[in-house]
């Protein structure tokens, strides 16, 4: 069976669902309007590569983080703060601000660290030659393996943990790029995409809620990188911090997610990691760059 036989064409889909076509008629070949100005103009473009020459700064620690305190960025800084809380001095790091609204992610230096031009990126200078790691899930896994923490060694438990990490990586785009965009950022609020992505986000919350019904943490009794990866997205969602959507999604009804979220928010390393590379919100919780533990003590 071919792909064409597996999936209906757009016209066939309209026929199946008894829907009228939308007012937008796509051109035969889409072309990028480089003169278009909107809040995302400096974030999104249809090509990869650098737009300007600029080296990345390098601090005194072996681990160099280039990021912003989005949910994906917070995963990495929370992971590092958790390692430091265990007394692992080798996890000391410098965290440099990458302002994606200004196009910092398209500098030659950042593209060298992450050819995908998305935050966060990590460069480990403790290896024979600098090791670059990009994609937030890959970074937390790299750090867990490097330092032997927050990732089970038992084969079955490890598989469970990594399954949840990859669940988060696969699910969050529906939450952020799907629901978040159409609910909070799109020029017009349209019923169809909001309903479509709302249904998926509520399904994801239910997946988590059912999993946490008889588990203290995502994978059981132990706190792991699965919790570290999932909490910045779904914990923030449960607290009503994402897209001002708490009431709309009825997040309070997911009791197990609420209990888990509150427990993680009590962890000092979580609260510290959430501040790093943060340039919005409460002034007292902002820390554009972090170069030593004392930066977070003020």
Regions found by a protein language model. Name each.
Residues 2-13, 19, 163-266:
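GST-like fold's C-terminal all-alpha helical module
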Residues 138, 256, 269:
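Residue-level recognition of oxygen-bearing side chains
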Residues 1-195, 199:
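GST-like domain detector, emphasizing the conserved glutathione-binding G-site
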Residues 154, 176, 241, 274-277:
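Short, flexible helix/strand-to-coil boundary loops that buttress conserved ligand/catalytic motifs
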Residues 39, 278-298:
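Acidic/histidine-enriched, glycine/proline-rich intrinsically disordered or flexible terminal extensions
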């Amino acid at each position: 069976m071919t792909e064409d036989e597996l999936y209906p064409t757009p016209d066939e889909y309209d026929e199946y669902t008894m829907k009228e076509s939308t007012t937008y008629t796509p051109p035969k070949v889409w072309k990028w309007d480089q003169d278009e100005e909107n809040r995302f103009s400096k974030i999104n473009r249809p090509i990869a590569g650098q737009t300007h020459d600029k080296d990345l700064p390098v601090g005194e620690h072996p681990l160099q983080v280039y990021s912003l305190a989005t949910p994906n960025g917070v995963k990495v800084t929370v992971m590092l703060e958790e390692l430091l809380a265990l007394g692992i001095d080798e996890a000391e790091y410098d965290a440099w601000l990458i302002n994606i609204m200004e196009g910092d992610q398209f500098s030659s230096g950042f593209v060298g660290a992450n050819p995908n031009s998305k935050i966060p990126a990590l460069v480990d200078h403790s290896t024979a030659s600098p090791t670059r790691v990009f994609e937030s899930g890959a970074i937390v896994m790299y750090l867990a393996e490097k330092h032997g923490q927050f990732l089970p060694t038992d084969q079955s438990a490890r598989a469970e943990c990594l399954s949840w990490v990859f669940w988060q990586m696969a699910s969050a785009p529906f939450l952020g790029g799907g629901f978040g965009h159409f609910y909070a950022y799109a020029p017009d609020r349209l019923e169809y995409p909001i309903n479509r992505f709302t249904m998926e986000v509520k399904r994801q919350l239910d997946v988590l809620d059912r999993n946490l019904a008889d588990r203290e943490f995502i994978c059981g009794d132990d706190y792991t990188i699965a919790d570290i990866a999932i909490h910045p997205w779904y914990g923030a969602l449960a607290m009503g911090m994402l897209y001002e959507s708490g009431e709309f999604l009825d997040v309070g009804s997911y009791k197990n997610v609420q209990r888990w979220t509150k427990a993680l928010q009590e962890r000092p390393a979580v609260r510290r990691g959430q501040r790093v590379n943060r340039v919005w919100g409460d002034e007292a919780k902002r820390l554009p760059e972090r170069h030593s533990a004392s930066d977070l003590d003020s």
